[in-house]
Amino acid sequence: MNADRQDVSLLMEEIGVAARSASRLLAQAPTKQKDAALLAAAMAVRANIDDILAANAEDVADAVKSGTAPSLIDRMTLDTKRIEAIARALEEIAALPDPVGATMAEWDRPNGLHISRVRVPLGVIGIIYESRPNVTADAGALCLKSGNAAILRGGSDAMRSSQAIHASILEGVIAAGLPEAAIQLVPTSDRGAVGEMLKGLGGNLDVIVPRGGKSLVARVQEEARVPVFAHLEGVCHVYVDGEADLDMARNIVLNAKLRRTGVCGAAETLLVDEACAATHLAPLVAALIAEGCEVRGDEAAQKADPRVKPATEDDWYTEYLDSIIAVRVVKGVKDAISHIAKYGSSHTEAIVTANQVTADRFLAEVDSAIVLHNASTQFADGGEFGMGAEIGIATGKFHARGPVGVEQLTSFKYLVRGSGQVRP
């Protein structure tokens, strides 16, 4: 296909038509065939590891030269361990129950009609993402397992990596006898391709999932003519309650912030109950600084440790994706919930406390997609939820919320079986 700028519209139209055709076949594909494709793809990823690493090295080198932020470079960097994780994710998705055709509910009517509600694929799913080449495999595999065709538009900064991974995925798709257009990677970095996807590809795109920064998600939400599974920024919080164990709180805070700073589930704000500030605040701040984390805090945090920098109003809204955290002392769980409601992004929040009543209140009143008790926010991940992988963390409330796995990539229809009934 000619991918010159003047031909982007035609290119995307052809991709859309091919995807729609493939989606009809995928909707009827047996579970064994879909699983065979995913297992073969996992084998191909492992077999082609040298090619994938070489492609990724070129992408990373270009990113370093262009001054890309370290957090974004971390997201796009692949190594042997991360590539093995991609292969394992493919195998885990293959092992998941097939949602297509599953009966969600069924009942009989007094007139003898038998009604059942069953899961069906959405159709064609477009995924627009930045930096993370592993999304190429995860998103493609989840769409395939759920009987959907996928159109993947990865970021130009990781184009070579995505192409290398996509080539391995296609090996599995073709080996299993499924259509090559089941998982397509847009072969151009022209931004016009995104615009065409947002228009819906002439009715051939059923839903869009944006995976990227605030500006990308905002553009998709503003311009898309098809439904969007919004994956907003992760301004995630950890609230250390007055009845929190200090050692547990320290371990959770360090993991939530620093395990991987560039993931959307990384904690960006630490809230400490004034009831335990005298005993917990200074040790928590010191532990973060000892691990190389910059701390920006309110007056109480600054008094607890002179190394704390003053926090501005903007800090409470910021997704740093870096070794930086904002710290504030709050007046109990009610104040913590209010802070999260004002400054959070409805992504993931955690409470550390030994008080079950307080925990239950936090879990009930915090209006985020994922809320945890005594666990790190970095568990905000489809794989950790047993979904095999995720296509994103949906922070909206329409159709899907939280990790978007195979079930969330389906809709449903009603099957009505009768014996000649007519309506009076």
Swiss-Prot record:
Enzyme class: oxidoreductase
GO cellular component, one term: cytoplasm
Protein name, per record: Gamma-glutamyl phosphate reductase
Family: Belongs to the gamma-glutamyl phosphate reductase family.
Role: Catalyzes the NADPH-dependent reduction of L-glutamate 5-phosphate into L-glutamate 5-semialdehyde and phosphate. The product spontaneously undergoes cyclization to form 1-pyrroline-5-carboxylate.
GO biological process: one example: L-proline biosynthetic process
Keyword Cytoplasm tagged: yes
The keyword Oxidoreductase is annotated on this UniProt entry: yes
InterPro entries: Ald_DH/histidinol_DH, Ald_DH_C, Ald_DH_N, Aldehyde_DH_dom, G-glutamylP_reductase_CS, Glu-5-SA_DH, GPR_dom
Annotated gene: proA
PANTHER family from the UniProt entry: DELTA-1-PYRROLINE-5-CARBOXYLATE SYNTHASE, GLUTAMATE SEMIALDEHYDE DEHYDROGENASE
Keywords from the named record: Amino-acid biosynthesis, Cytoplasm, NADP, Oxidoreductase, Proline biosynthesis
